[in-house]
Amino acid sequence: MKVLVIGNGGREHALAWKAAQSPLVETVFVAPGNAGTALEPALQNVAIGVTDIPALLDFAQNEKVDLTIVGPEAPLVKGVVDTFRAAGLKIFGPTAGAAQLEGSKAFTKDFLARHNIPTAEYQNFTEVEPALAYLREKGAPIVIKADGLAAGKGVIVAMTLEEAEAAVRDMLAGNAFGDAGHRIVIEEFLDGEEASFIVMVDGEHVLPMATSQDHKRVGDKDTGPNTGGMGAYSPAPVVTDEVHQRTMERIIWPTVKGMAAEGNTYTGFLYAGLMIDKQGNPKVIEFNCRFGDPETQPIMLRMKSDLVELCLAACEGKLDEKTSEWDERASLGVVMAAGGYPGDYRTGDVIHGLPLEEVADGKVFHAGTKLADDEQVVTSGGRVLCVTALGHTVAEAQKRAYALMTDIHWDDCFCRKDIGWRAIEREQN
């Protein structure tokens, strides 16, 4: 069968690479893909943008694509799933209505409140003055979020009132995030440890994926501004069996049932960003209506199940007949980024030292890369590669991932040196 993966990041390289391992599959197309997917023998890039839904549909129909897997949020919010389904094509992802769980922070917070799903206390604002009054009433630390899609960067954790007020003015009056910031959510600062809890949903049944933990801040020891994610590992030891059960009972099931009850039946990957307190009680920080990036990369490296088989079962409402199998080992991925990210960065730098053949128990996933006219791999984004490895412990996986990137370099590249530090501290204690 033929599979189409929509997207061009590290997440899509990992999903397409995994899909191509299925015995059911003869070809995996990636639209538009990157240099990594271009160089994979089993994958084929297609020059169509992720939100060009008419062109994606034409391609899928002409090529007789049997299954489409959507990577990023933008096409989901624009209704790619609705369009493909209306044309009778199999596609795994939520409808535009269901994708509001990520497309609007205010929609999500109101939904959580309606269904008594644990989350931070909050209020929505469109005007500067009432927002500032609320800030002064609540004090700092406090969290300010742009309502719409801001590529994972529309969240400010303000440690002082001055910082909070500046963020509100930037978003509501200064247009810092364009349309995404025309409405903001202000919410209480939650203390605890974060985890990424990702599941597959078929509208009614849920199949949990392996747990993971992302590293959002750009600098070591979680300093500096938020990014799309600088590295991740799986599994996340903070998600004990008990926390896993609580998350399913208090968050995932009520969300799936609540969405269905409100007429937005959810199918696709559902990613709950959790904050877990000292007592092991999870609260929802955010929902994403897709797999996380960079979490996908270490999770796919551990996945033993057939991803395509699971997606097909989900499209048919038969996820309850499936289980997922994982490598017992831990995996860890480190993002190599362009100097200046998450601010302004340069593109077009040649990347040297990429491994020429497959690596045992490791993989270099490409994100912001493209093939230049002379077939050299050059940078084309802020997050450029995710260097990922397996190990019997998180510490071993970390050591292998950093060893794998020793020879890889380009002008002004950087990475965090401490990915996995929380899990490693746990292992050492």
From Swiss-Prot:
Cofactor needs: Mg(2+); Mn(2+)
SUPFAM superfamilies per the UniProt record, alphabetical: Glutathione synthetase ATP-binding domain-like, PreATP-grasp domain, Rudiment single hybrid motif
Organism: Escherichia coli O6:H1 (strain CFT073 / ATCC 700928 / UPEC)
Catalytic activity entry: 5-phospho-beta-D-ribosylamine + glycine + ATP = N(1)-(5-phospho-beta-D-ribosyl)glycinamide + ADP + phosphate + H(+)
Listed GO MF terms: ATP binding; metal ion binding; phosphoribosylamine-glycine ligase activity
Alphabetical keyword list: ATP-binding, Ligase, Magnesium, Manganese, Metal-binding, Nucleotide-binding, Purine biosynthesis
Protein name: Phosphoribosylamine--glycine ligase
Family that this chain belongs to: Belongs to the GARS family.
Stretches assigned to the ATP-grasp domain: 109-316
